[in-house]
Structure formats: C-alpha cells, structure tokens
C-alpha cells in the first residue's frame, strides 16, 4: 500500500479548500506523505495571528467581493486569484521536513524550464533583468507529531490588484530596501508564456512521485458534494465564520475622528476577539447625550459595520430629534470600520 496521498481540489472557495486542508492534516496517519493542490478565487488570506483591519483594505474587499480567509499557519497576508497555484505538503514527524517539500517544488519548476532558488525562510525567487523576483511564498504549521508546508506559485496573477487589498507595513518594506509590493514579485508567465495551473500541478505531482519513488491515484475534491472527510461540515463552518476570520484578530485599539456640521466626534475603541471591550466618545456637539448613550451601547458589540450601524440607529427611539445627526454618524462609523 502506498504511503502517498494526492488530492486535487476543483473548488475555488478558500474556506472550502482550507477546511479540506485542516481535515486531512488532523486525520492523516503519521506514516503518510500528502500533497494537496488547489487554488482560490479572489481572496485575501491572512496568517493565524494577524489583524485583518490592519493588514487589509476590508472596505475595498467588500466592495469588490473579495473574501477574507484566516489560515491556521503563521506569516503574512497574501492575495490569491485564479492565477495562483496553491500547494500543501504534509508528513508525520520526524520525517516532516520543509526543505524536502521546497526541493520538490524547485525540481518541478526546473522540469518546466524555470531556474528558481530558495531565498530566506519562506520565498522562492527567480533572477530577472531587474534583479531577484519572488514567485512563491510559504507558511508552515507543526504539531507534536506532524507538520505541513503550504505555499503559492504566481502563474499569471493580476499583480496590480495586490495594492488594492493589502496594506503593507511601510517601515518593514523600507527596512528591506523595497519600494512597493508589486516590485517584489513576478509571474511565471513572464518566463514561461502560456503556463497553466494544470501544467504546474502535473509538474509538482511528478516531482513528488519521483522524490518518494511511488505513485498513487489522485483524489479529486469536488465543490459539488461534501468531501468524505471526518468533521468536514464543522471545520468548514468554522473556517467560513466571521468569528474565525475577523474575531480571532489580536487585541487592538482604533481611533476614529470626524468633523460634522453639528460638531466634531472622536471615538476610541478597544477591541478583543472581534468585540468592543471599551468605547469612549469625545465631542464638542451642543447635544452630547446621544453620543454618550452610544458609548454605553457599543460596549460588548461586535466590531462589525452592520452591528455598529444597528446600535446607532437604535438610539433613534430615545433621540428622535437627533435623527439627522445619528444617521450621519451611523453611515460614517460603518464606513470607517469596513
């Protein structure tokens, strides 16, 4: 019986694919070596410990129907579209070794005619006339008895969209001598015009088989039926939930301020696990009562635009004469936290 397992997803849903990954990882035998190949439609994928409001332009994502997905590994935020091929290698310990999976991907690229090399801990780069350019980024997860290495390969991703949805740390970029996110990366189509997702998957699969000296039939994961994986429904529900994707953000504070015709408003929020734990309101409005009431109502509220709007509009019952001000305030707060 083969020690290998190969799974290929036909779904473009990031929550579905990450749930498949999680289920396989949890239930795989320690002696198995797994390769999972997949890709996502328009999505920003953030690391397990990241704050989406800090890392992403969540308002723009909502306007453009770009999903947010939190993965279970660490690392930074990345934009996925169908021009990305995603791979996940899994193995039990002590055999799990990310240098093996990295070499498999490098061998696959080499077979396609691309000479790439590992750079730092997470990246694969190619040499271009403009210097080294990243074509792959990775992240890792380990438990007591197993580990996985997952990453992306840029085939023909729309790189102009990266800046639309990601807010890179400018200090970090400056420290590395990088002027923009776009200048760091390149698509494999620049080196191999016409390269397809299917060709890349085939090359990685063949390199995987060659490394282990075994072959196995691929299991196709269809989006049209629930995968036969233990606890998939529960895992998918968690992976697609607001509580996981947004609510798992580390504690943070948010200061909002705006001047309206009727006065200036400053809101201070402390947020933990996606809930407002403290709300303070400062204003020079001649009628501060509704704003003071709002501060009380927002304590414990989900840090979500629709919930904040709901709390603002609930004040119309007690302060009907301030309807204009409260509706302006509601629209502003909702826009500011999207």
From Swiss-Prot:
Pathway: Protein modification; protein lipoylation via exogenous pathway; protein N(6)-(lipoyl)lysine from lipoate: step 1/2; Protein modification; protein lipoylation via exogenous pathway; protein N(6)-(lipoyl)lysine from lipoate: step 2/2. Keywords: ATP-binding, Cytoplasm, Ligase, Nucleotide-binding. It is found in: Cytoplasm. It is an enzyme of class 6 (ligase). Residues 29-216 form the BPL/LPL catalytic domain. ATP binds at residues 71, 76-79, 134. (R)-lipoate binds at residue 134. Its EC number is 6.3.1.20. It comes from the Bacteria. One of its GO terms (cellular component) is cytosol. It catalyses: L-lysyl-[lipoyl-carrier protein] + (R)-lipoate + ATP = N(6)-[(R)-lipoyl]-L-lysyl-[lipoyl-carrier protein] + AMP + diphosphate + H(+). GO terms for biological process: protein modification process. Catalyzes both the ATP-dependent activation of exogenously supplied lipoate to lipoyl-AMP and the transfer of the activated lipoyl onto the lipoyl domains of lipoate-dependent enzymes. PANTHER family: LIPOATE-PROTEIN LIGASE, LIPOYLTRANSFERASE 1, MITOCHONDRIAL. Belongs to the LplA family. Monomer. This is Lipoate-protein ligase A. It comes from Escherichia coli O1:K1 / APEC.
């Amino acid at each position: 019986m083969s020690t290998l397992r190969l799974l290929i997803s036909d779904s473009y849903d990031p929550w579905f694919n990450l749930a498949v990954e999680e289920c396989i990882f949890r239930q795989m035998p320690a002696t198995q070596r797994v390769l999972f190949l997949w890709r996502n439609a328009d999505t920003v994928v953030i690391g397990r410990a990241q704050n989406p409001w800090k890392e992403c332009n969540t308002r723009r994502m909502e306007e453009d129907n770009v999903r947010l997905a939190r993965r279970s590994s660490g690392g930074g935020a990345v934009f996925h579209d169908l021009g990305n091929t995603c791979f996940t290698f899994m193995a039990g310990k002590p055999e799990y070794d990310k240098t093996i999976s990295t070499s498999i991907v490098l061998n696959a690229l080499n077979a396609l005619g691309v000479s790439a090399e590992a750079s730092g801990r997470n990246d694969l780069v190619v040499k271009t006339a403009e210097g080294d350019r990243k074509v792959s980024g990775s992240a890792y997860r380990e438990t007591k008895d197993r580990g996985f290495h997952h990453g992306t390969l840029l085939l023909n991703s729309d790189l102009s969209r990266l800046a639309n949805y990601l807010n890179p740390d400018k200090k970090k970029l400056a420290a590395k001598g990088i002027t923009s996110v776009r200048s760091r990366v390149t698509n494999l189509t620049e080196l191999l015009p016409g390269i397809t997702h299917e060709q890349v998957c085939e090359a990685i699969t063949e390199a995987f088989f060659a490394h282990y000296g075994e072959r196995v039939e691929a299991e196709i994961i269809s989006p049209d039926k629930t995968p036969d994986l233990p606890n998939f429904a529960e895992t998918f529900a968690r992976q697609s939930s607001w509580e996981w994707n947004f609510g798992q953000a580390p504690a943070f504070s948010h200061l909002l301020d705006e001047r309206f015709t009727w006065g200036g408003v400053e809101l201070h929020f402390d947020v933990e696990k996606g809930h407002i734990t403290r709300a303070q309101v400062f204003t020079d409005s001649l009628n501060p009562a509704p704003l003071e009431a709002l501060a009380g109502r927002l304590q414990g509220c989900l840090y979500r635009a629709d919930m904040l709007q709901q709390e603002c509009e609930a004040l119309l019952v007690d302060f009907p004469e301030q309807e204009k001000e409260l509706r302006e305030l509601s629209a502003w707060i909702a826009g500011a936290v999207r």
